[in-house]
């Protein structure tokens, strides 16, 4: 295979350059970057923007000249000041900032130290650009379009940005309140320039980068002013280079590989010996611990202490005295372990332990083993960790699942592999550095793998440290040639993934994706093992190689190691193929651009930053400012009270094929609820003084919700809260409502663009838009400009799809991003850690949603004399009784004879449904509780939901995990809630006396 990166043509700086942004890097945010020791070394704010052109040429662009800023609302008493008095107070404040000190608190190791600090450090005067007065509106609460005087603090560096932020935070008690200091300056730059953070930009005025500190491995390295970067509309994605990697490791004991070994395994083995009843003394301890450096210490036929592998030659004359010194402590721990019985319930209740002193939980036993491990690790020689034996890498380019390059780096020899580069190394140190060099040559835009945030990257980092090559391995691992990357350990809590600890390399210019985390976030699966994911989504089951087989084959021949290599490359390629199949790049690029955050954020950050950036942009456009609200500050008096969530109507079970079924579905219920009642922070009346009676321009709507306290069975209603929201008579909406309207409208328009046709006239001119036939003419409507064009058919040369399949995929991903973002906005308003958290709006949204559902139900039942019911799918092997031409049959759905055709309109928004098909039988009727009913259509589709089999006295039913069942009281329960003995509600037929007998086959036919 040819190497995927080619030499780029020489840069012509006189020509415009266009590229798609892939990543953002802020040097001042880099904790590994050397801190300036003097003011002269301190740089002004820089942004590095990485991207790729339409020809696959990589670009690094340093953007200079942008000045970060935030706002401060002065004490309320200042609002009453005249302009002259306000100006005087401002001058006094500026003098204080420029000349004075303030008291700071330094916290370390749980201790606080107070000290005085100069507000603007000596020599950094130029980093403070200005402190001025501006007029803005407050996002937090309805103020009837009132402008307030705010202090705008503008700086030239991130260091000064944080300095001023800390200073004004110390002035909270004086009444100063910060606004938007929690918005990263580069996000604000994105907002101001109307740039899509993963979109296309054009730069006309630039020069080649000449600062070695910013030299990268990109094809073009350029420098420009922040005003020269402009957004452009390009409806495709650049040919991004996507690399996937996987590591294979050895294990000295045949168990799970450990990168840095201590004596935990020895401690566990000693615990087993202790529990077997063996007595310990100092000599026995010394014998065991000295033997394990040569061979297993065999205690009995089934009990041994495994051999260990020290880094260096063991000098027993040194370690023996250390063992004897600590022998008493070791014996004490082992004696305690030998006298316990383990309580598998892991019950830590103090009373129970006191009543049964010999009982110990698994957790408590692990603590004892950990103490023993600490002693052994302290006195005994350091051990070798389990080595990385192979690193596989595969590459594909966006737009195709074809693997354009394969590489395997192997410890020791490895046979050649067709269409793959095989590199054999004599040491693990060489192996790691070879892979680092490969990354430099490949220069991927995207680096992916499976569980790399949970295993691979941390393992590689530890092995680099153990081999004493961490600096060489990490330097230039990203795109900057001189920058040293680091392993980031990040704790992330989100609704999609729960609590997680991510461990990854902070690679500048390279977007790192752990496919496992994406699958866990976006899909519900029985198992998230790679082979199961591959089988579900691409129908390809990988050739598995068990861990013990890997360990055995590595010790074998070059051919054996080639088997491991093929397995490793296979895993890498599966990741590439799944990324392509599930359109992960399209979906996440669309989401990044909708929410105005970098692509990297979607894989390493929670939901909050996405929505916050979007809201901040809309606030900026409408001259509103968002206060910095920490949870303790924004808690209202009733905040600890709960509120009622969504409503679920009880289903009326049955198969409804005789009468037509009409589905009533709100288009995005919660967003629609918020739009309908203008539920937005800037329209929520918090201060009655702004609610003007008989205002000619504004009406006011009261929305109430029930307050609850307690949970579960103890939950009870404790009151009702009424909230007032401003309603503009001219149809204007609040900021949140406006955002939702925009998102839903853009989604609708984006979906329509997928249907665009290009009509080319005979004179070669062309028109794009939604095409409809009007007799002898075509009518073309263009969504962007609203123009309608009519063209006679006789003047038309051709009619073709405007967009190709790749472009349609981008639009499809974009419309999905609009939908998800609209639904996520409500969630962030109700999330206590969110910068826009406001419980009253979240509660009013759910209250309105419940009202809308009940309103629709009552309307249908009152005006159309209809029933509101629910339905669910059944498994294909479910038997049904049906008839055709007066002949009765009992058969399963999967055995129905007929022509199955694609049915894409069924549940289009359900990501868990694949390959939808329909079958429309002719003159077929099915038996229902209402008699014989004609079958309109039968629909079948794959699902990735769990299937539960529920057995009852009447038979069994197989249902999906979210299927609604009714308990004996008629309440809805899910299959997961069913236990043995749970009573379900049955619908039994009416029995009547009848003396005629039928045979078994007839009985089966009649059900």
How does the language model describe each region?
Residues 2-9, 202-206, 551-688, 694, ...:
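Common nucleic-acid-contacting/processivity interface regions adjacent to the catalytic cores
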Residues 45-55, 123-126, 131-133, 138-139, ...:
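Core structural elements
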Residues 167, 175-195, 666-669, 675-680, ...:
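Conserved catalytic core of nucleic-acid polymerases
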Residues 456-466, 667-681, 903:
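Short active-site loop/helix that positions an aromatic residue
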Residues 873-1006:
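HINT superfamily self-processing domains
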């Amino acid at each position: 295979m040819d190497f995927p990166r080619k030499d780029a043509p020489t840069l012509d700086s006189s020509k415009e350059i266009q590229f798609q942004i892939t990543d953002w890097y802020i040097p001042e945010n880099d904790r590994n970057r050397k801190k300036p020791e003097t003011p002269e070394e301190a740089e002004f704010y820089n942004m590095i923007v990485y991207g790729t052109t339409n020809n696959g040429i990589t670009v690094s662009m340093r953007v200079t000249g942008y000045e970060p800023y935030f706002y401060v609302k002065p004490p309320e008493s200042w609002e009453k000041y005249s302009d002259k008095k306000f100006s005087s107070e401002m001058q006094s404040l500026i003098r204080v900032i420029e000349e004075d000190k303030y008291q700071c608190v330094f916290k370390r190791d749980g201790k606080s130290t107070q000290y005085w600090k100069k507000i603007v450090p000596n020599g950094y005067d130029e980093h403070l650009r200005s402190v001025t007065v501006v007029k803005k509106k407050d996002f937090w609460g309805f103020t009837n379009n009132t402008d307030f005087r705010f202090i705008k603090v503008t700086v030239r560096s991130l260091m000064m940005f944080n300095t001023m932020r800390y200073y004004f935070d110390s002035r909270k008690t004086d009444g100063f309140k910060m606004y938007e200091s929690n918005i990263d300056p580069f996000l604000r730059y994105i907002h101001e320039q109307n740039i899509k953070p993963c979109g296309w930009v054009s730069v006309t005025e630039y020069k080649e980068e000449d600062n070695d500190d910013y030299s990268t491995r990109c094809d073009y390295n350029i420098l420009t002013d922040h005003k020269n970067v402009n957004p452009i509309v390009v409806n495709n994605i650049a040919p991004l280079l996507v690399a996937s990697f996987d590591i294979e490791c050895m294990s000295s004991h045949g168990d799970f590989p450990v990168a840095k070994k201590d004596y935990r395994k020895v401690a566990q083995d000693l615990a087993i010996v202790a529990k077997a009843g063996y007595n310990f003394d100092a000599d026995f301890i010394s014998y065991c611990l000295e033997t394990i450096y040569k061979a297993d210490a065999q205690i009995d036929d089934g009990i041994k202490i495994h051999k260990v592998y020290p880094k260096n030659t063991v000098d027993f004359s040194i370690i023996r005295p250390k063992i004897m010194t600590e022998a008493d402590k070791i014996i004490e721990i082992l004696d305690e372990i030998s006298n316990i019985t383990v309580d598998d319930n892991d019950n830590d209740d103090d009373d129970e332990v006191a009543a049964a002193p010999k009982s110990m939980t698994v957790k408590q036993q692990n603590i004892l083993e950990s103490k023993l491990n600490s002693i052994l690790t302290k006195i005994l020689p350091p051990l070798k960790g389990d080595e990385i034996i192979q690193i596989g890498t595969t590459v594909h380019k966006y737009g195709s699942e074809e693997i354009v390059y394969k590489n395997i780096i192997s410890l020791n020899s490895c046979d050649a592999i067709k269409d793959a580069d095989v590199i054999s190394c004599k040491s693990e140190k060489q192996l790691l550095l070879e892979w680092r060099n490969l990354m430099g040559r490949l220069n991927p835009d995207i680096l992916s793998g499976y569980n790399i945030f949970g295993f691979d990257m941390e393992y590689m980092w530890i092995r680099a440290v153990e081999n004493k090559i961490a600096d060489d391995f990490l330097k230039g691992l990203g795109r900057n040639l001189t920058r040293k990357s680091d392993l980031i350990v990040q704790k992330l809590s989100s609704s999609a993934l729960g609590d997680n600890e991510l461990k990854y390399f902070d690679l500048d210019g390279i977007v790192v994706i752990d496919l496992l985390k994406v699958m866990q976030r976006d899909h519900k699966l029985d198992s998230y093992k790679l082979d199961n994911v591959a089988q579900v989504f691409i129908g390809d089951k990988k050739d598995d190689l068990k861990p013990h087989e890997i360990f055995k084959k590595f010790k074998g021949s070059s051919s054996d190691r080639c088997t491991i290599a093929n397995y490793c490359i296979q895993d890498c390629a599966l990741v590439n193929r799944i990324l392509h199949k599930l359109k992960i790049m399209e979906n996440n690029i669309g989401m990044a651009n909708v929410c105005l955050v970098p692509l990297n954020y979607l894989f390493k950050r929670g939901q909050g930053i996405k929505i916050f950036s979007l809201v901040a942009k809309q606030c900026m456009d409408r001259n509103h400012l968002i206060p910095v609200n920490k949870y303790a500050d924004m808690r209202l008096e009733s905040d600890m009270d709960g509120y009622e969530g969504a409503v679920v109507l009880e289903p009326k079970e049955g198969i409804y094929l005789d009468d037509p079924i009409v589905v009533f579905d709100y288009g995005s219920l919660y967003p629609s609820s918020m739009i309908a009642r203008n539920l937005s922070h800037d329209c929520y009346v918090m201060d009655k003084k702004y609610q003007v009676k008989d205002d000619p321009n504004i009406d006011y709507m009261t929305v109430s919700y029930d307050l609850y306290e307690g949970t579960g069975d103890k939950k009870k209603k404790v009151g009702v809260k009424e909230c007032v929201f401003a309603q503009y008579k001219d149809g204007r909406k609040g900021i949140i409502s406006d955002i939702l309207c925009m998102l839903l409208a853009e989604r609708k328009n984006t979906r329509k663009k997928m249907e665009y046709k290009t009509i080319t006239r005979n004179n070669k001119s062309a028109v794009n838009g939604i095409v409809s036939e009007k007799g002898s003419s075509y009518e073309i409507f263009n969504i962007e400009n609203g123009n309608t064009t009519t063209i006679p058919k006789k003047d038309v040369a051709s009619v073709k799809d405007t967009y190709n399949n790749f472009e349609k995929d981008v639009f499809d991903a974009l419309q999905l991003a609009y939908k998800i973002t609209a639904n996520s906005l409500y969630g962030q308003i109700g999330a206590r850690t969110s910068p826009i958290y406001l419980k009253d709006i979240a509660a009013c949204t759910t209250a309105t949603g419940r009202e809308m559902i009940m309103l629709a139900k009552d309307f249908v039942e009152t005006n159309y004399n209809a029933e509101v019911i629910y339905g669910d799918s059944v498994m294909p092997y479910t038997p049904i009784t049906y008839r055709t031409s007066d002949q009765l049959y009992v058969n399963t759905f999967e055995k129905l004879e007929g022509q199955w055709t694609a049915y894409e309109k069924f549940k289009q928004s359900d990501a868990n449904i694949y390959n939808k098909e329909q079958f429309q039988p002719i003159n077929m009727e099915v038996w229902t509780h209402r008699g014989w009913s004609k079958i309109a259509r039968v629909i079948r589709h794959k699902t990735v939901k769990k299937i539960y089999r529920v057995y009852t006295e009447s038979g069994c039913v197989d249902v999906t995990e979210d299927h609604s069942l009714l308990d004996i009281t008629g309440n809805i329960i899910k299959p997961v809630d069913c236990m043995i003995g749970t009573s379900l509600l049955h619908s039994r037929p009416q029995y009547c006396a009848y003396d005629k007998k039928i045979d078994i086959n007839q009985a089966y036919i009649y059900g």
